[in-house]
From Swiss-Prot:
It is an enzyme of class 1 (oxidoreductase). InterPro entries: NAD(P)-bd_dom_sf, SDR_fam. The active site is at Y154, K158. Its EC number is 1.1.1.-. Belongs to the short-chain dehydrogenases/reductases (SDR) family. Keywords: NADP, Oxidoreductase. Pathway: Pigment biosynthesis. This is Short-chain dehydrogenase chry4. NADP(+) binds at R37, D55, N81, Y154, K158, V185, T187. One of its GO terms (molecular function) is oxidoreductase activity. Short-chain dehydrogenase; part of the gene cluster that mediates the biosynthesis of the yellow pigment chrysogine. Pyruvic acid and anthranilic acid are likely substrates for the nonribosomal peptide synthetase chry1/NRPS14, with pyruvic acid adenylated by the first A domain and anthranilic acid by the second. If pyruvic acid and anthranilic acid are merged and released from chry1/NRPS14 by hydrolysis, a subsequent amidation would lead to 2-pyruvoylaminobenzamide. This process is probably catalyzed by the amidotransferase chry2 using glutamine as amino donor. It holds the Pfam family adh_short.
């Protein structure tokens, strides 16, 4: 039995992965952004070990989530599933657009503060291949609301996440750090017209959570078919990897250990 935490697990991929992992007798901790959502998911998944509550658009709440997770103990697997794509423009407490914060900054903070688990899984996307790879204005602070475009921002954040996965993999020597593209499937994030099959992505989540792969692998990218895939070539650039780490450190004041 593995101890597993899945962020953003009140619906979509996170919920379904949690449901299946609970059925497989794992100790699964859920995450909800508020008490109402927590109460709803506890009713739907009564076999969950617990529900942690945090709004991942703020530093303080993300830090609280890490503290509460650490108090439970070291996890076998953590899936950083929470994400945003479309929706009205709003800012995090640091002035960063909420989707950039949830997709990139909050996972960085959480990973930096968490007791390293055996397996740490970040949600990437095949859309990272469409990103602006220049690393200019990573957090959209210069462009702001007037120039905001949610789809390009999402693509960029996922490119930065794959860079971050590589950087963290060099630091967490005893952790298998993985990026995964879950697939373009009907979820709240992707919309109900998405053509893919959720079952494929869920199977990959379950495989990674259970460690049913070569766990000596780290800093690698999986597709929804449980296979390793080739990320954008520039995600192997060490300077770009460290530039994303430095940007996140300077923004948040929270540091990763040195590689």
């Amino acid at each position: 039995m593995a101890r597993i935490l899945i962020t953003g697990s009140t619906d979509g991929f996170g919920f379904e992965a949690a449901r299946q992992l609970i059925e497989r007798k794992h100790q699964v901790y859920l995450h909800a952004r508020n008490q109402e959502r927590a109460d709803e998911v506890k009713t739907k998944l009564p076999g969950a070990a617990g529900v942690l509550i945090a709004d991942l658009t703020t530093v303080a709440e993300t830090r609280k989530l890490a503290d509460e997770a650490n108090a439970i103990g070291t996890f076998d697997a953590v899936i950083l599933n929470a994400g945003l794509l479309y929706g009205p423009f709003r800012k995090s407490d640091l002035g960063v657009p909420a989707s950039v914060f949830v997709n990139l900054v909050s996972p960085y903070i959480f990973a930096a503060l968490l007791n390293p688990p055996k397996r740490l899984i970040f949600i990437a996307s095949v859309l990272h291949h469409e990103a602006d790879t220049s690393l200019k204005d990573i957090f959209w602070l210069e462009r702001g609301e007037k120039e905001w475009k949610d789809f390009p921002a999402y693509c960029d954040a996922k490119f930065h996440v794959v860079l971050l996965v590589n950087a963290i993999a060099r630091r967490f020597k005893d952790t298998s750090v993985i990026a995964v593209h879950p697939g373009y499937v009907p979820t709240k994030l992707a919309g109900q017209d998405a053509p893919g099959k959720m079952e494929d992505g869920i199977e990959t989540y379950v495989m990674l959570a259970e460690g049913d792969y070569d766990t000596s692998l780290t800093g690698v990218y999986f597709d929804p078919k449980k296979e390793r895939a080739q990320p954008h070539a520039l995600t192997a650039d060490l300077d770009k990897q460290e530039a994303v780490v430095k940007a996140c450190e300077e923004l948040t004041g929270i540091k990763l250990p040195s590689p």
